[in-house]
Amino acid sequence: MARKKIALIGAGQIGGTLAHLAGLKELGDVVLFDIADGVPQGKGLDIAESAPVDGFDAKYAGASDYAAIAGADVVIVTAGVPRKPGMSRDDLIGINLQVMEKVGAGIRTHAPNAFVICITNPLDAMVWALQKFSGLAPNKIVGMAGVLDSARFRHFLAEEFQVSVEDVTAFVLGGHGDDMVPLVRYSTVAGVPLPDLVKMGWTTQEKLDAMVERTRKGGGEIVNLLKTGSAFYAPAASAIAMAESYLKDKRRVLPCAAYLTGQYGIDGLFIGVPIVIGENGVERVVEVEFSAEEKAMFDKSVASVKGLVEACKGINAALA
């Protein structure tokens, strides 16, 4: 049986980490694409030379021509400019929109049947634009945001409660920006909701609020520490979890930026919501009930995404 083919558009920090994880998890053969000739080839060779030590069989190729992604089962897009200290994700919109246009054309021509995961920021607007540029069916393209944001929240909670991260579940919905919505009511430790843990004296409401705020600012915290780039280990791990659910038809319920057609009262936007990812891509959008306060936060987040999408239309008339 032929191995699956995973194409990685962008061979920077996230792209290289994705390539390594895809091999370690034996998800398939990997093609690294980057416009910086030599970088994808070098990283691919380096990882291939680690395979005998780690004990996995996967072919690695590097390329600077989109023809190399032909027939890919999964395409993960990280191409674009990362954040620097003092920048918001939204500051990247002009330059990364141009990148999405080129990437979309490459996917449309060479990998029109792939399941596509977009990581490029500002995420919710870039995945929207990439769908338009690529012509992909909306169920075959998603944005990586909620898995990462939820993982950050889970890490902070596990540290606070001194329990395994495996026993902490968390839901972060909405746009991948400062208005994201960590849903405390739907987040649990071993099935016990966080509000109950506050009542039990495990933590205080103030500490919980601080963790929610730290989650919202989680990406910026790392940008400010690194000074020369943005997070890459956790974003790569998050995208690999999504790719694995598709390739293995695991049907995991994961918060992702998905195309909505009336769910949550939204039509025609990619917004972070819980979805089921299986062999057909987005198999189902899970609609959870919001309290009035949660709905207000979610609506604010959606308004931010709408603003970014309108900005994209203003920059590129083809999207209007």
UniProtKB/Swiss-Prot annotation:
Where on this chain does substrate bind?
83, 89, 121, 152
**Oxidoreductase as a keyword?**
yes
Does Oxidoreductase count among this protein's keywords? yes
- GO term, biological process aspect, one: tricarboxylic acid cycle
Task: Enumerate the active-site residues.
Answer: 176
GO MF annotation terms: L-lactate dehydrogenase activity; L-malate dehydrogenase (NAD+) activity
Q: EC annotation?
A: 1.1.1.37
Name of the top EC class for this enzyme: oxidoreductase
Q: Which amino acid positions bind NAD(+), per UniProt? A: 10-15, 34, 96, 119-121
Sorted alphabetically, which Pfam families does this protein's record hold?
Answer: Ldh_1_C, Ldh_1_N
Q: Which reaction does it catalyse?
A: (S)-malate + NAD(+) = oxaloacetate + NADH + H(+)
Alphabetically sorted, this entry's keywords are:
NAD, Oxidoreductase, Tricarboxylic acid cycle
What family is reported?
Belongs to the LDH/MDH superfamily. MDH type 3 family.
Supply the HAMAP family for this chain.
Malate_dehydrog_3 (MF_00487)
The record's function comment reads: Catalyzes the reversible oxidation of malate to oxaloacetate.
The record, for NCBIfam families, names: MalateDH_bact, PRK06223.1
The protein's name: Malate dehydrogenase
Name its species.
Methylobacterium sp. (strain 4-46)
Source taxonomy = Bacteria, Pseudomonadati, Pseudomonadota, Alphaproteobacteria, Hyphomicrobiales
